[in-house]
Amino acid sequence: MGVNDFAIERVWGLQVLDSRGNPTVKAYVKLAGGSLGWGIAPSGASRGEREAVELRDGGGKWRGKGVSRAVSLLNTVVAPRLEGVDARRQAQIDRLLIELDGTPNKSRLGGNTTTALSIAVSRAAAAQARLELFQYLGGAGARRLPIPLLNVINGGVHAGNELDFQEFMIIPYGFESFTEAMRAAVETYGELKSLLKDRYGASAVNVGDEGGFAPPMRSAEEALKTLVDAVEKAGYQPGSEIALGIDAAASQLYSNGRYSVEGKSLSREELLSLYQRLVEQYPIVYLEDPFSEDDYEGFKAAVDALSTETIIVGDDLLVTNPQRVKEASALKAVTGLLVKVNQVGTLTEALEAIQAARDRGIVHIVSHRSGDTEDTFIADLAVATEALMIKTGAPARGERTSKYNRLLEIENILGYSAEYAGPELRGVMGRR
């Protein structure tokens, strides 16, 4: 018998840096046929308690954030077990990683180790198959480009200002192509920069972790009003062309049954009232983590009150976990799933979470992390899985624009067969 070109010949890893200058894991997979795949694990600032554990060294070097132990495990424990395995058997390989780790939260090998390696395997197999990664993962029918969610005003743990909610986003959905949507977003971002500089001074246009601005604002309403002004100044229609979104990251605001928002201690009901008022006043179609990750009742109340106008998205609540998706669906606690491969630690488990959501009528949104890298894997994943949206920051900073540039490239590759997901969101806006 001849050599299987897809057989894994060599696996290795090394320590590289993410966009915050923190170490992370990069994995390589080389196949017998000569193809090379790679993947880099991102890292979040606000993390759900049930996420896969990042394995870090501790101690004094790299301020305790080194990943040399994770890289060593990849090179000495994992690599020998993968040699000779067919890289097309993604699920088998990911199950082997889960088995080798042997913990419920990947605390032995580290979710950063397994994420980087899982991505690298898929990229190697796609290269050997002479396919674009999105086509390898999604098949010949993968042709829909997601709606970009652009985090252009930062708050919470992503910024040093007084805004409690973590992200304020523009959502250019009312366009015929991804390219047109990005043009509108970039123009709006530019107008926002000018507005903020005029109103708050030059320091207001310094950018945060995800490329958004961190102006000295104090209220969500102030941020949303400014976004509407920027959309209009750019020549677009708020609501019908560019909608708005919020990631409250409410777990960061929660303590002892109350939510600390804008100098007030709010009950679940009071916080929901705030969201209702904001949705009534502004074209908000996306609301992520409106309540704490354990507050299923809060999420359910948000779905009951707002889901005809706004997608209620679980991030910390669901942590890309298929079982959590099923539980939340049974309680009618979400209408959207945020997908972060490193939350669960393997591509296979992330795909299972997406399928669990799809089976239950829950849309999915593929997402970056605040500590990200030049790896563009999530752009291909979004197209492959027909994600409604992709969340990957402002149109600034290379680790953010790399994903947008990959999506622009994919749209170009697809040519006339490319579709844009924007029209799907018009149904939500049409109910306003």
From Swiss-Prot:
One of its GO terms (molecular function) is phosphopyruvate hydratase activity. Disulfide bonds: none annotated. Catalyzes the reversible conversion of 2-phosphoglycerate (2-PG) into phosphoenolpyruvate (PEP). It is essential for the degradation of carbohydrates via glycolysis. InterPro entries: Enolase, Enolase-like_C_sf, Enolase-like_N, Enolase_C, Enolase_CS, Enolase_N. PANTHER family: ENOLASE. Its cofactor is Mg(2+). CDD domains: enolase. Keywords: Cytoplasm, Glycolysis, Lyase, Magnesium, Metal-binding, Secreted. Binds a second Mg(2+) ion via substrate during catalysis. Belongs to the enolase family. Mg(2+) binds at residues 247, 288, 315. GO terms for cellular component: cell surface; extracellular region; phosphopyruvate hydratase complex. This is Enolase. Pathway: Carbohydrate degradation; glycolysis; pyruvate from D-glyceraldehyde 3-phosphate: step 4/5. Gene3D superfamilies: Enolase-like C-terminal domain, Enolase-like, N-terminal domain. One of its GO terms (biological process) is glycolytic process. Its main location: cytoplasm.
